[in-house]
Regions:
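Protein kinase-like catalytic core scaffold
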Residues: 92, 140-142, 182, 200
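Active-site ExK catalytic segment of metal-dependent nucleases
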Residues: 93-100, 145-147, 203-205
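Conserved structural core of kinase catalytic domains
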Residues: 98, 117-173
Length: 229
């Protein structure tokens, strides 16, 4: 067996070994406590800003605050929610996520990461801390394995794979649903065809079904933002 074949066979296995860390659970618990407290005192779920401030305090107090994101790797890209850094030394991708796709509180964000790791266990997210992005916004720092890819997946390949997983296109393919979870942004730039022939869903938006995910996505995605004149 040559080296290339070994790489192809081992990439998927190595990705599966990545497990979500306890930091995500800790951060989720802190955010949940803030939400419960605000709901009790004010009868509202609108507490996103308070949750982010509390998480920043927690990260700074526990040596989890990364002062300079450039220490993670080389700046690679800026998407709608993630600022991406690449470390070729560690074969990792680091994403500073600014919580854009959480509406009035952060709990859907933590649920989404857990769901992603359940559905797409070959390229899971692991939380390693928090940092400010280039816009000065506090972000959670997530890492994923660097995927050796031949190319972006095609829309047809993405649809075929999601159908295989039990998801069906809704609203003329605007998103995919299995009745439990709704997947948005499963577009070619967010799904890679690995050198092992496997599709890797590296960056999708997921909401629980029947929780208003479509309206939330449309209200927060730059794809639907009013154009400035």
């Amino acid at each position: 067996m040559d080296g290339n074949t070994t790489d192809r066979l081992s990439q998927k296995d190595n990705c599966r070994k990545e497990k979500i860390g306890s930091l995500l659970d800790e951060a989720s618990t802190i955010a949940r406590r803030v939400l419960d407290s605000i709901q009790t005192l004010a009868g509202t779920t609108a507490c996103k800003g308070v949750q982010i401030a509390r998480l920043k305090e927690w990260a700074q107090s526990n040596n989890l605050w990364i002062e300079d994101a450039r220490t993670l790797g080389t700046f690679s890209d800026r998407g709608s929610e993630n600022e991406v850094y690449l470390s070729l030394e560690s074969n990792r991708v680091y994403k500073l996520n600014d919580f854009r796709y959480s509406d009035d509180n952060l709990m859907p964000f933590f649920e989404r990461i857990r769901i992603h790791n359940r559905l797409f266990e070959d390229c899971p997210y692991v939380m390693i801390g928090m940092a400010e992005n280039q816009s000065g916004k506090p972000c959670v720092v997530l890492t994923q394995p660097y995927i050796l890819a031949e190319r972006e997946a095609t829309e047809e390949e993405i649809t075929e794979e999601l159908l295989r997983l039990g998801f069906h296109p809704e609203m003329e393919g605007e998103y995919f649903s299995n009745g439990y979870f709704d997947i948005f942004d499963a577009s070619p730039n967010n799904v890679l065809m690995g050198i092992d022939g496997h599709l890797y869903f590296i960056d999708t938006i997921i909401y629980k079904s029947d929780t208003g995910g479509l309206d939330t996505y449309r209200s927060l995605s730059p794809n639907y933002s009013p154009k400035l004149h």
